[in-house]
From Swiss-Prot:
Chief localization: secreted
Keywords: Glycoprotein, Secreted, Self-incompatibility, Signal
Recorded superkingdom: Eukaryota
Taxonomic path: Eukaryota, Viridiplantae, Streptophyta, Embryophyta, Tracheophyta
Organism, scientific name: Arabidopsis thaliana
Name of the gene encoding the protein in the UniProt record: SPH30
Protein name, entry field: S-protein homolog 30
Keyword Manganese recorded: no
Length: 130
């Protein structure tokens, strides 16, 4: 009798999760963002209107809580007077990681929009703080 065993590490067969940040504010309006997790800080960056979206790709931290936040800022004449600290991804403590999750966040003049799936409309979920 022949027994074959295949062993994968926790993340080898798991497609990375994606957090996508889009700037849909207005021509000339810059979105400033600072994204960080419990294990990584990506620093402060800027995204031009309709530029290629910024994407964070990651695996869930097992068995710890995986959480990503992004502080989004914008304003007329790049004043950055409007902001929101958004919890853009959260997976509770677990033994089996979430795989291939999408969290899309879009900054628009009237608020912050969200979608969990590709090819679904973004819906406003937050209003800017001043």
């Amino acid at each position: 009798m022949l027994v074959t065993i295949t062993c994968f590490g926790l993340n080898q067969a798991c497609i990375k999760n994606h957090v996508v940040i889009l700037n849909l504010l207005a021509p000339g309006r810059i979105l400033e963002y600072h994204c960080y997790s419990n294990v990584d800080d990506l620093g402060v960056k800027r995204l031009d209107f309709n530029a290629t979206p910024f994407t964070i790709k990651f695996h869930d931290e097992i068995p710890n809580l995986t959480k990503w936040n992004c502080i989004l800022r914008q304003g007329p004449n790049n004043s950055m007077e409007y902001s929101y600290d958004v919890e853009v991804y959260k997976a509770g403590p677990r033994l089996i990681p979430r795989c291939g999750q999408l969290r899309a966040w879009a900054a628009r003049i009237d608020g912050i929009y969200f979608a969990r799936k590709y090819n679904t409309p973004l819906k406003r979920v937050l209003f800017w703080n001043k």
